[in-house]
Design a protein with these regions (language model features):
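An extended, acidic
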Residues: 1-106
C-alpha cells in the first residue's frame, strides 16, 4: 500500500494491510495505489484474493490491471495465470506506475 503523505512531495509509506481492505483504501482515496509484485514471474495469484476488491476499486473509478497494464481476467479459472503482478490506482496515477514498472519486469 502506498499511503498519501502529509506533504505532497513527502516520503512514500508502505503499510501492511490484510485481506481485500487494500483495494477499499485506494477506492476511498486513503491510499494512492496498491502494488503487488511477486519475485517469481511464474507465480499466479488466486482469483478469490483479488476479485471482490478489484470490483470495489473499479466501481469507485480506479484502474486495476496486472503490472503490464493488461486487465485481470477473473473468469479464466481459479488463478490469474498470465497476469504479472497487480496494480490498482486512480487513472491519473495508474499509467505512470505501469510505465515505471516496465524496466523492472523485463
Amino acid at each position: 500500500m502506498l499511503f498519501r503523505s502529509a506533504a505532497a512531495a513527502g516520503p512514500v509509506h508502505a503499510v501492511r494491510v490484510d485481506s481485500q481492505a487494500k483495494y477499499a483504501l485506494v477506492a476511498r482515496g486513503d491510499a494512492d495505489a496498491y502494488l503487488r509484485l511477486s519475485p517469481d514471474a511464474a507465480y499466479a495469484e488466486c482469483v478469490w484474493d483479488h476479485a471482490a476488491g478489484a470490483l470495489v476499486a473499479s466501481e469507485a473509478g480506479c484502474t486495476v490491471t496486472d503490472a503490464h497494464g493488461v486487465p485481470l481476467d477473473f473468469g479464466a479459472g481459479r488463478r490469474l495465470f498470465g497476469a504479472r503482478g497487480i496494480v490498482c490506482a486512480p487513472p491519473r496515477l495508474h499509467a505512470r506506475l505501469v510505465d515505471a514498472l516496465r524496466p523492472l519486469l523485463g
